[in-house]
Amino acid sequence: MGRPVLVIPGMLSGDRSTALLRASLRQAGFDPYGWQEGFNVRVTTQAIARVEGRLADIATSTGRKVVIIGWSLGGLYARLLAHRRPELVALAVTLGSPFSGNRRANNAWRLYERLNDHTVDAPPFPEEISAKPPVPTIAMWSTKDGIVAAECARGAPDESDARFELPYRHFELGSSRRAIAVIVGALHNFMEEERP
């Protein structure tokens, strides 16, 4: 079985939204997993703990470190888990995720604050998401995103190990076959570089 990959959906989305991405990863030889949390709506300490438990379960059952791919809000989970559990994470990949800079430089922050009991500036975790986690990281971003400002999804050079610009809109980043081909290619390149 290939490298396990935990795929975390964006805000107001669930595992169905990442079905094509996971199917493509499986076809490419990876071992993908959905997050199994229903729709990604509220960020709470309990939700974070459950996703952390999901990561630990996958790492334990496969005996391998896990690649985490997070789309939009899911990417914040990916980076958070990479900070908290680096011993379980092989690579953290963000797809159009607003992890850097102004947390209001996107078209979803007002909705996020309506759905949650905290502001975008005071999330329910102490980790600084913009700081590079102690594991390899890839940020995928787009100037055509339309939801998240490119500079917030790209981040500063010292906030990720690699940054890839994709010419797609926000809702295509994890569902377009062309975007998925780039994601799968980046994962294959990482796996090749990881080999001794």
What are these regions (language model features)?
Residues I48, G174-L187:
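Post-His helix in hydrolase/transferase enzymes
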Residues R26, T143-D161:
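Conserved loop-alpha-helix segment in the C-terminal half of the alpha/beta-hydrolase fold
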